[in-house]
């Protein structure tokens, strides 16, 4: 890696201070989303990259993500998260299954990586203005934590129905929380209004090159922690795409034989449709999970990267997801949020569809976070048990499926 850095980093000159600094240790919703985009793909490229140093752009104008990942600032605040073997599941599936434990981050989510990397690359002369973002929880906590570390005022707009555990943690971390609107699109509109009125700096939860590169450091860590020889596939939540795009673009450059598998809930099909077709797709109705965390469409930059790096997308049901939550607990005694547990559910389904006699093959699932509202633990455990015995139920003891979107935020 040192050799690579010597090749790609420009020589010291008068402009060198404007370049992203290399971390001393650099030798990743349910993913956030918004359904509304006003930009075409080309204009998106120009907008996202207009303030990026030329040395970090490829000849075609797109970001050089390998260089951005290698020079990421995330290790100012995060440590390399462990790869935890899940022995019972491995024995059951006949292969080696590992969890990448992003739930062990300071804010219990991979989102800290992207938020901090973006904010650490802001011009220090502008930071006094403060930052603003919109989120259902995990990105909000990442921004609030980063803002405290970097001493930048932060305003976070969250939907009114955001679980208490989310907005209270954001406030505890020092963020100024505004609860506004019924969904993330409404919160996004309010954040944009505040940005214009108060001249704040926007920290988007998705589709920003520095955010994607921050999440891509997860892929870099994987290849530090495990030999790529037997690594057959890495599974992560498809969502709006910044996580899988960042991990995928690094792994495909360094270990191109590794399959990148996205996992998505059965109802939100925007990601699957976008991957299967040539057009960028936005669904009119994302279905049951639309309150806070539904993915109506992948981010535009993430969608572009999808086409290059993602092998396939597996769909799983809510009951399969809750069953995987129980599997993880039995192996690790950790409660992973359903947005992270669905990845293991997808891994299990993929193994059943792709059997192999090779017991040395290694599969990695990205456990993206552990921000679960305590009040929903009962629903998770009961649904997991029912999924095992009876195949699911519409309503359990008065807790209906209408509450499920908040489990996935």
Curated annotation (Swiss-Prot):
It is an enzyme of class 4 (lyase). It comes from the Eukaryota. Gene3D superfamilies: 3.40.50.1100. Pathway: Mycotoxin biosynthesis. Pfam families: PALP (PF00291). Residues 1-21 are annotated as: Disordered. Pyridoxal 5'-phosphate binds at residues 138, 239-243, 368. The modification N6-(pyridoxal phosphate)lysine is found at residue 111. One of its GO terms (molecular function) is threonine deaminase activity. Its cofactor is pyridoxal 5'-phosphate. Gene clusters encoding host-selective toxins (HSTs) are localized on conditionally dispensable chromosomes (CDCs), also called supernumerary chromosomes, where they are present in multiple copies. The CDCs are not essential for saprophytic growth but controls host-selective pathogenicity. Threonine dehydratase-like protein; part of the gene clusters that mediate the biosynthesis of the host-selective toxins (HSTs) AK-toxins responsible for Japanese pear black spot disease by the Japanese pear pathotype. AK-toxins are esters of 9,10-epoxy 8-hydroxy 9-methyldecatrienoic acid (EDA). On cellular level, AK-toxins affect plasma membrane of susceptible cells and cause a sudden increase in loss of K(+) after a few minutes of toxin treatment. Belongs to the serine/threonine dehydratase family. This is Threonine dehydratase-like protein AKTS1-1. It comes from Alternaria alternata (Alternaria rot fungus). The gene is AKTS1-1.
């Amino acid at each position: 890696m040192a050799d690579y850095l010597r090749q790609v980093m420009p020589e010291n000159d008068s402009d060198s201070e404007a370049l992203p600094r290399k971390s001393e240790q650099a030798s990743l919703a349910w993913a956030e989303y918004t359904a509304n985009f006003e930009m075409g793909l080309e204009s998106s490229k120009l907008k996202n990259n207009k303030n990026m140093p030329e040395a970090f752009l490829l000849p075609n104008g797109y970001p050089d993500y390998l260089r951005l990942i290698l020079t990421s600032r995330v290790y100012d605040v995060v440590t390399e998260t462990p790869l935890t073997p899940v022995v019972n599941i491995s024995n059951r599936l006949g292969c080696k299954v590992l969890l990448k434990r992003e739930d062990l981050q300071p804010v219990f989510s991979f989102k800290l990586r992207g938020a901090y990397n973006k904010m650490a690359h802001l011009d220090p002369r502008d930071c006094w203005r403060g930052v603003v973002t919109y989120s259902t929880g995990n990105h909000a906590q990442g921004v609030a934590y980063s803002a405290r570390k970097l001493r930048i005022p932060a305003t976070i707009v969250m939907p009114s129905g955001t679980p208490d555990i989310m907005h209270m943690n954001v406030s505890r971390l020092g963020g100024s929380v505004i609860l506004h609107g019924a969904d993330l699109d409404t919160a996004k509109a309010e954040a944009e209004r505040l940005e214009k009125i108060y001249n704040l700096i926007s920290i988007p939860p998705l589709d920003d090159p520095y955010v994607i590169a921050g999440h891509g450091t997860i892929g870099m860590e994987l290849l530090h922690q495990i030999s790529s020889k037997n690594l057959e596939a890495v599974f992560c939540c498809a969502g709006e795409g910044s996580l899988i795009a960042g991990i995928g673009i690094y792994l495909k450059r360094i270990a191109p034989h590794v399959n990148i598998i996205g996992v998505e809930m059965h109802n939100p099909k925007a990601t699957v449709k976008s991957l299967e077709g040539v057009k960028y797709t936005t669904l009119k109705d994302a279905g049951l999970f639309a309150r806070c965390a539904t993915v109506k469409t992948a981010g535009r930059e993430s969608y572009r990267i999808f086409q290059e790096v993602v092998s396939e997308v597996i769909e799983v049901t809510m009951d399969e997801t809750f069953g995987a939550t129980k599997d993880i607990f039995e192996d690790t005694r950790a409660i992973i949020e359903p947005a992270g547990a669905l990845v293991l559910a997808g891994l299990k389904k993929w193994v059943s569809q792709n059997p192999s006699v090779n017991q040395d093959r290694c599969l990695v699932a990205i456990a993206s976070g552990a921000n679960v509202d305590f009040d929903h633990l009962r629903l998770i455990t009961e649904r997991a048990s029912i999924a095992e015995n009876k195949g699911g139920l519409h309503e359990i003891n008065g807790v209906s499926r209408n509450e499920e979107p908040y489990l996935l935020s």
